[in-house]
Amino acid sequence: MSSSETQKMQLYSFSLSSCAWRVRIALHLKGLDFEYKAVDLFKGEHLTPEFLKLNPLGYVPVLVHGDIVIADSLAIIMYLEEKFPENPLLPQDLQKRALNYQAANIVTSNIQPLQNLAVLNYIEEKLGSDEKLSWAKHHIKKGFSALEKLLKGHAGKYATGDEVGLADLFLAPQIIASITGFGMDMAEFPLLKSLNDAYLKYQHFRMRCQRISPMLDEAKS
């Protein structure tokens, strides 16, 4: 029996990280027990030698499960999906499954990396705070427009139907962070706005939103 079979999972996370937020939602939706390990990015705790041993890039989240270390939100969620197939996050229908992958990829490749803390700090340093906000909003709008087109005709109560799926784990944190952190007007994106309304009514999504909103306000002040 491997050590991962018997040891409690540890999640290294930062409260304001939308990437880590995805994993926390997945763990709760699957009903999995885990130990929360806070990593304060503002204090540079992600750059300590101890943390860099877990992820040389210095990013959160990181999941440790026995002797298994995974340092990427999508990789972590796919590991959880295969290791713990109960309460699945991916539908059996191949078209819906592909839609979930595409929506998650738009967030992970075309939105979040271009407006994360490190990138925005660099842009502010080089070009000023006004350009930082303009940059972030430009890439969020571009990604949200693509998501609206992708999910049109496929969304139900949630992104790809009436059951929570992988796509929702990536959309919910991104949408609320865009509204609260960057002042995005979701009236331009009616489908995503409708999804966000549904997320706010769902226990595991709502719990995370209620915690993150005041933290974002504090971080901006």
UniProtKB/Swiss-Prot annotation:
GO terms for biological process: glutathione metabolic process; L-phenylalanine catabolic process. Induction: Accumulates in response to the phytohormone ethylene. It catalyses: RX + glutathione = an S-substituted glutathione + a halide anion + H(+). Residues 7-88 form the GST N-terminal domain. Keywords: Transferase. Belongs to the GST superfamily. Zeta family. This is Glutathione S-transferase 1. It comes from Dianthus caryophyllus (Carnation). The lineage of its organism: Eukaryota, Viridiplantae, Streptophyta, Embryophyta, Tracheophyta. The gene is GST1.
